[in-house]
C-alpha cells in the first residue's frame, strides 16, 4: 500500500508482527503522504475501527485452518533436505483460542464466515476481497480449504469473481515426487489459490446477506 501511495490498515493478533510492520513502515518514502496503520487486535473486531463503505480492497492470507499446528515431517523433501531447520517443529503462530490456526476445518469455516460477514458492510459496492489460501493433507485426507472459504463467503453475501492459481514452482524444484517410486501423490504445496471476491453492487443488509 505504501509503494502505491494508498491508505491502509492491517490487523494481527501478535504484537511482534505488528511491531515488525511498524518498523518497515518507518522506512517509507519521504514524500509519501498516505497513511498505513498496523493494529494489534482480533479480526473479529475490525468493524469497530472502520466506518461502513470506506474500504476499497481487502487482502489477506488467513491461517490455513490447523495446517501448521502439528510437527513438520517434510515428507515431500529429498534425502538430507528433509531434516532441515523446520523438521519436527510446530510452526503455528500462537496457541491463543482466538487464533484461527488452532481450529479444525469445520470450526475454522464457521469463524471465517462470521469474520467476513462483519467485514462486508465496510466494503464499498463492487470493492474487492482477495484471499490467499492453499489446501492441505490431514490424516491422509485432502482438505479443500479453498472450497470451504468460497462456500463460507458466498453464504454471507460475497460474490466470487475469479480464482487465480499462484504457481510456486521455485519451491517444487527443491522437493521430490511424494510417494515415488511406489506410488504418486499430487502435491498441493506446488501452488496456492487467490480467491477474488467482491461486494455485489446491489444492496446488502446489515447482517451481511444480500437483499437482492
Language-model features: locations:
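Class I S-adenosyl-L-methionine-dependent methyltransferase catalytic core
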Residues: 1-212
Amino acid at each position: 500500500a505504501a509503494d502505491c501511495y494508498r491508505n491502509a490498515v492491517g490487523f494481527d493478533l501478535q504484537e511482534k508482527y505488528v511491531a515488525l510492520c511498524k518498523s518497515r513502515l518507518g522506512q517509507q518514502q519521504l514524500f509519501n503522504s498516505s497513511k498505513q496503520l498496523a493494529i494489534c487486535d482480533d479480526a473479529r473486531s475490525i468493524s469497530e475501527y472502520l466506518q461502513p463503505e470506506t474500504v476499497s480492497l481487502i487482502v489477506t492470507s488467513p491461517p490455513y485452518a490447523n495446517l501448521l499446528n502439528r510437527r513438520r515431517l517434510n515428507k515431500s523433501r529429498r534425502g538430507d533436505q528433509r531434516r532441515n531447520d523446520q523438521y519436527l517443529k510446530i510452526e503455528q503462530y500462537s496457541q491463543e483460542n482466538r487464533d484461527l490456526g488452532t481450529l479444525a476445518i469445520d470450526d475454522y469455516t464457521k469463524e471465517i464466515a462470521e469474520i467476513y460477514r462483519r467485514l462486508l458492510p465496510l466494503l464499498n459496492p463492487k470493492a474487492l476481497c482477495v484471499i490467499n489460501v492453499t489446501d492441505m493433507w490431514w490424516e491422509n485426507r485432502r482438505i479443500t480449504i479453498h472450497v470451504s472459504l468460497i462456500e463460507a463467503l458466498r453464504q454471507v453475501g460475497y460474490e466470487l469473481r475469479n480464482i487465480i492459481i499462484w504457481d510456486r514452482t521455485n519451491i517444487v524444484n527443491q522437493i521430490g515426487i511424494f510417494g515415488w517410486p511406489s506410488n504418486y501423490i499430487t502435491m498441493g504445496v506446488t501452488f496456492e489459490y487467490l480467491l477474488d471476491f467482491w461486494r455485489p453492487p446491489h444492496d446488502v443488509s446489515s447482517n451481511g446477506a444480500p437483499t437482492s
